[in-house]
């Protein structure tokens, strides 16, 4: 630095080195002299106490002069030296920048040289199938290229060429690695590659090459070197994902979905093969322990032969990062594999009966052992997987499956044929399951109130209710509905021995059965219920049968179900009105249909007018015959189907409709000749004689006579109809006698206006008729 300042001063031309040195030396000596004089003066002043005032002032003047000289010299040095120093600094900065640019260029050239060397060495290693060194050299070339790209001053065209070269070389090594991978890991597929058929699965094979094949002329690298090279190049996840998907599709999933399929491991001197064989079995789905064992066998072979291979020492360069191939493959296949095991194996192992739940512990244990073995092989990490969670949550799955099976079975029964019937009634044996007696702890405690009587007499009622008072009357119901009710009882019985959660689900599943019936049956069988009167009657009975059981169904199980359900919710009574209404509305709709058909047939009778005309009489007679035929047909269709009381009311209502229509038409006639009256009487006599025959609720004719004799009870217009027949054949005197001043049977049957109208229609206008009309008041 001193030489640099000297050089600057030498070039300045304003100050010479020798001159400065001389003057500085002189100043130094002068300073020393003055210092000595000052010390001497102080000594004299304070030590010797001599008057030295004048000498001191002179010395002060000399010091001030010397200080001024020093300041001037310093200012001159700073001015001239700083100016020349600034000029030199700029030159030095320029030189430094040039040096930095040269260093950058030199560094870029060095990176280019390293890139070129790496590519050359890579080509040599690739030619010798030393994939790991080749991959590492390619990685070094990649790093060199990244450094070159980070320098903005580098030629973009050259960078593009280098990038393209690197891409080509990477694809080249990947191609060679892929070729050797296909030789080391060989798949053999059937022509169709169809995994759904057993024949195709039996033709699928996987071969893992462990040593150099004799037929192979060129040496093959080891599987470990290929996998490590893939890892260095960043392609290992992609390769393992592709392998894992094929493993799932062609080996693991077929083993789970096909119970007869088993894996066979064949070991050759230079390879290990995984193929299939079929063993006869009656199972539609493999038991979980068997499926786990088949999967574990395949994964053990893969873990030993493919995923846990040592790296060749002569191929390693530096530290090799730990690669857990089994863990990587496990991440690829486990989610789909566990889902497949759940859907095709564990789901079907769920017991259908709560008594078998205890046996399911074996399956839970086998699932735990299966996961433990996979963790030991490092296919799985430490967390509990969905497979084991599913197996342990057996109570919930059992309840869900049981409820699903119940609803499916119920819907199948609801959509089955209605006309397949069974007879029920007080005398028929029920096949509903017997309920166990409640334990002593569950018995209902009845509080007995003690009442004191003054006179302790016999408190029993004189008359008692018939034992059948609360029984469902004898009728026929669908066999499917009887099975449906049995299913409801069995499900509730199952709930009594189940866990709280399961019991609640089963109870509400039974309620859902009846809600489903209310929605499905009227919709699914709508057309048949509208067209076929027998099915409408059976459906009516079905609804009444269900409502009858719902009245006491909850009460029967209240003391046996879990306490959660014993707070008043264990009931089905709220469903009873809906079922009664459902059955009644369906049957009433059928009754309206039958009424419409009867009235339509009677409309062809031409209002029963002009019966002396053969054509009119024939039409009326035909209409009456058709109506009676329809009623008899309905009587046969509903025979032994409807309860007797419902049957008689229904037939009585329809017959009453016919009779009321005939009465209305006849009483509306304005003129009835003698011949007309005779023929009208004949038509009415036909109805009167054959009408009771439609009352045949039972198949035994002898038992039906009772109901045929009680026709007036069910047909309100029966007695007026008989009075009408009498009037058609009676004289004015007889009519007057039957009126009996408004107290006779005729007055009970008809109002006076209708009686007068009939008299006017039947008899000519004479004094006798006028007298008779006068009596009708």
From Swiss-Prot:
Residues 2-81 are annotated as: Interaction with ZWINT. Gene3D superfamilies: 1.10.357.150. The keyword Cell division applies. GO terms for biological process: cell division; endoplasmic reticulum to Golgi vesicle-mediated transport; establishment of mitotic spindle orientation; Golgi organization; mitotic metaphase chromosome alignment; mitotic sister chromatid segregation; mitotic spindle assembly checkpoint signaling; protein localization to kinetochore. Residues 14-130 form a coiled coil. The modification N-acetylalanine is found at residue 2. Interacts with NBAS and KNTC1/ROD; the interactions are mutually exclusive and indicative for its association in two different vesicle tethering complexes. Component of the RZZ complex composed of KNTC1/ROD, ZW10 and ZWILCH. Component of the NRZ complex composed of NBAS, ZW10 and RINT1/TIP20L; NRZ associates with SNAREs STX18, USE1L, BNIP1/SEC20L and SEC22B (the assembly has been described as syntaxin 18 complex). Interacts directly with RINT1/TIP20L bound to BNIP1/SEC20L. Interacts with C19orf25 and ZWINT. Interacts with ZFYVE1. Belongs to the ZW10 family. This is Centromere/kinetochore protein zw10 homolog. The gene is Zw10.
């Amino acid at each position: 630095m001193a030489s640099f300042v000297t050089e600057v001063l030498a070039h300045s031309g304003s100050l010479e080195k020798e001159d400065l040195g001389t003057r500085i030396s002189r100043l130094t000596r002068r300073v020393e002299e003055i210092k000595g004089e000052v010390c001497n003066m102080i000594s004299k002043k304070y030590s010797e106490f001599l008057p030295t005032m004048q000498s001191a002032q002179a010395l002060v003047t000399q010091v001030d002069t010397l200080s001024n000289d020093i300041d001037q010299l310093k200012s001159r040095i700073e001015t001239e030296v700083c100016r020349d120093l600034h000029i030199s600094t700029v030159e030095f900065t320029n030189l430094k920048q040039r040096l930095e640019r040269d260093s950058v260029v030199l560094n870029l050239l060095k990176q280019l040289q390293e890139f070129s060397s790496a590519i050359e060495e890579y080509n040599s290693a690739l030619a010798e199938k030393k994939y790991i060194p080749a991959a590492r050299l390619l990685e070094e070339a990649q790093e060199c290229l990244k450094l070159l790209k980070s320098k903005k001053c580098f030629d973009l065209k050259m960078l593009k060429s280098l990038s393209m070269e690197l891409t080509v070389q990477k694809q080249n090594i990947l191609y060679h690695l892929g070729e050797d991978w296909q030789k080391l890991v060989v798949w053999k597929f059937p022509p169709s590659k169809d995994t759904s058929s057993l024949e195709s699965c039996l033709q699928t094979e996987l071969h893992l090459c462990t040593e150099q094949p004799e037929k192979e002329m060129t040496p093959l690298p080891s599987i470990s070197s290929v996998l490590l090279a893939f890892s260095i190049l960043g392609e290992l996840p992609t390769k393992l994902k592709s392998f894992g998907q094929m493993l799932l599709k062609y080996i693991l999933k077929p083993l789970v979905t096909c119970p007869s399929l088993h894996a066979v491991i064949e070991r050759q001197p230079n390879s290990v093969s995984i193929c299939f064989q079929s063993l006869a079995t009656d199972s539609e789905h493999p038991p979980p322990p068997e499926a786990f064992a088949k999967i574990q066998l395949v994964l053990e072979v893969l873990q030993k032969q493919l995923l846990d291979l040592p790296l060749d020492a002569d191929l390693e360069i530096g530290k090799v990062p730990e690669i857990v191939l089994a863990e990587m493959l496990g991440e690829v296949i486990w989610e789909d594999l566990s889902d497949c095991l759940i859907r095709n194996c564990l789901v079907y192992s769920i017991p259908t009966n709560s008594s078998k739940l205890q046996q399911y512990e074996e399956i839970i244990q086998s699932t735990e052992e299966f996961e433990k073995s996979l963790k030991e092989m490092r296919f799985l990490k430490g967390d509990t997987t969905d497979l084991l969670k599913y197996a342990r949550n057996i109570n919930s799955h059992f309840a869900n499956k049981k409820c699903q099976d119940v609803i499916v079975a119920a819907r199948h029964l609801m959509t089955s044929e209605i006309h397949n019937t069974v007879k029920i009634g007080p005398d028929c044996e029920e096949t509903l399951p017997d309920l166990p007696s409640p334990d002593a702890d569950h018995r209902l405690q009845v509080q007995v109130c003690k009442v004191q009587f003054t006179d302790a007499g016999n408190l029993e009622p004189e008359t008692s209710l018939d034992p059948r008072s609360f029984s469902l009357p004898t009728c026929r119901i669908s066999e499917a509905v009887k099975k449906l009710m049995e299913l409801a009882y069995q499900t509730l019985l199952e709930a009594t021995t189940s866990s709280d959660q399961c019991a609640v689900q089963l109870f509400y599943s039974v309620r859902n059965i009846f809600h489903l019936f209310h929605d499905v049956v009227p919709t699914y069988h709508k057309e048949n219920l509208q067209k076929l009167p027998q099915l409408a009657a059976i459906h009516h009975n079905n609804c009444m049968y269900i409502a009858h059981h719902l009245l006491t169904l909850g009460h029967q199980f209240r003391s046996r179900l879990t306490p959660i359900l014993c707070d008043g919710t264990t009931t089905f009574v709220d469903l009873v009105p809906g079922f009664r209404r459902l059955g009644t509305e369906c049957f009433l709709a059928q009754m309206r249909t039958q009424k419409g058909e009867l009235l339509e047939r009677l409309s062809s009778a031409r209002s029963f007018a002009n019966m002396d005309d053969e054509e009119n009489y024939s039409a009326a007679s035909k209409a009456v015959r058709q109506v009676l035929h329809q009623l008899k047909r309905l009587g046969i269709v509903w025979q032994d189907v409807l309860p007797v009381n419902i049957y008689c009311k229904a037939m009585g209502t329809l017959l009453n409709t016919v009779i009321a229509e005939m009465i209305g038409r006849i009483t509306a006639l304005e003129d009835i000749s003698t011949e007309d009256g005779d023929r009208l009487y004949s038509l009415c006599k036909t109805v009167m004689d054959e009408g009771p025959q439609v009352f045949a609720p039972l198949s035994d004719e002898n038992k039906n006579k009772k109901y045929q004799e009680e026709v007036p009870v069910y047909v309100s217009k029966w007695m007026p109809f008989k009075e009408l027949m009498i009037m058609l054949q009676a004289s004015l005197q007889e009519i007057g006698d039957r009126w009996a001043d408004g107290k006779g049977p005729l007055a009970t049957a008809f109002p006076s206006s209708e009686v007068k109208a009939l008299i006017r229609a039947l008899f000519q206008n004479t004094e006798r008729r006028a007298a008779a009309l006068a009596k009708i008041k």
